[in-house]
Amino acid sequence: MKIPSQQVLLALPLLASPAQSYPGKHPRCSAGDACWPKEHVWQDFNSTISGRLIRTFPAAAVCHTAQYDAAACSVAKERWTDSFWRTNQTGAYSAILWELGEKGQCFINTPKEDRCDQGIVPYYSVSASGVKDIEKAVKFADKHDLYLVVKNTGHDHLGRSSGSGAFSIWTHNLKGKEWHKSFKPKGAPSNVSGIPAVTLQAGEQLLDVYKAAAAEGVTFAGGSAQTVGAAGGFMTGGGVSPFSHFYGLAVDNVLEVNLVTAQGKAKTINQYTDPDYFYALRGGGGSAWGVITSVTYKTHPKPTHIRVGIAQLNITTEDSRRVVIEKTLQALPDITEAGWVGYGVYATEKSNPTAFQVIFLQPNATMENFNKTFEPMNEIATLPGVTGGAVSYVFPDFLEYSKNFLRDPNIATNVIDASRLVSRQVLTERARDLVDLMFEYPTTGPGFNSIVKVNSDERDNTAVHSSFKNSRALISFSVDWADNASEKEKKAAKKTSAEVSKRLAEIVGKETGTYLNEASPYEPDWQNAFWGDKYARLLSIKRRIDPKNLFVCNRCVGTDIILEP
């Protein structure tokens, strides 16, 4: 594909200001800078990757004058909140915030003549078809000192896969699944036995993997989403799963990673080829460690069934709301220690008659187990001013459960989270403090992105925060704003997110971390909250494998890019 030079020139005025430079930090070359490669240089590079260079625009650009396409605009409007559609667009992200940035405008339902800014969507992207494309792209970025980002599906809560004036490597189209009856990592000693596994190319998405796993008769410990990439940031961030109680986090199941390094070389990383690098990849976060091309995971036996428990507690008097929230918080540790994994939301606003909703699941659980475990929920429902209770459903496998309950929430919104892992002690002894925080910030949608006692047998062998060992849930507070919100309104919401992070840290203890894939992009104590005492080791590994700091992203190990509220 040849990109007309006049198209580039016309687009340049639409750019937001170049990537921020920080005093004393490494200034990278962004679109609009004098150091940005000339058009003929880009065209020469494009010829080496079979025309896979894409001039990238925000998802709504097809509905505005410069890039207007009536047919494409109609599809975009129809499928604007469809996560399957958005992951197939080079310039689309799950959150509009990471397309438009602080001041950008390019909205889907505004008149054709309205302005459409570049925002923080990368200026150029390489739609990688294989390892060679990625090797060439990394070397090109290194040669020209470009601001380089890596994008898979764009499900990124921390804004790590976009950047103003950046050059992007897009791995979404790397597809392929290979199921192994007996897999041995490269370099493993002869006495190491092979185990069942699956090798997933970077672009594979969770729902497709679940469908294939069902056909293979195995279980894959992926996340609670449909379109999230199974072999990208989900894994490097830890990867909480509905099966984490039994099989741990996604990183605990990783046997091997194939990637392209900062030197533009393809490598296979596992516990035998490079133990430190393998440690960093399993929980070190974001794209700080290279461009992942495939991941090999353990697989597990298929359960006989999936039992689901759903509880809903409604209030008929407002005085009951605090009581319901506090008592359910205190009940959660026993439920998850009995092997149930769940997701729940609280409502503190007076207009909502439902105080608490939660869904749990457990493979192979019996009805007797359900009745005993959820008895506290039914007891809460008998309190004055409270109705509801818990019910159970059974599905033949996880795929059938997925068809009924798996969704991709908050698509095409501006939602950001503030979160912390919480222990049994916090849930039982500091429940009232958590309730007070919920009522202090009633519009933040408090809830649990996961309720799970994680199997942490591998915790010391991965970079994931050690507080997962004692956690029983991930409590989260979310803020959002309308696309057309004022700059003042946006800043207020972001500051609220940062404030809640601080308050949560005070309640749970500053030594307690969070799940970095669902953390605040403005987390003030990010090194400690994401990795704790593991950060020093990670930084040392980062300096060895990426001495020029080519791979950078917001609040990633060794980064000099720190987004501020």
Swiss-Prot record:
Main location per the UniProt record: secreted
Necessary cofactors: FAD
Protein name in UniProt: Uncharacterized FAD-linked oxidoreductase ARB_02478
EC number: 1.-.-.-
Organism annotation: Arthroderma benhamiae (strain ATCC MYA-4681 / CBS 112371)
Pfam families: BBE, FAD_binding_4
Enzyme category, top tier: oxidoreductase
InterPro entries assigned to the protein according to its UniProt record, in alphabetical order: BBE, FAD-bd_PCMH, FAD-bd_PCMH-like_sf, FAD-bd_PCMH_sub2, FAD-linked_Oxidoreductases_BP, Oxid_FAD_bind_N
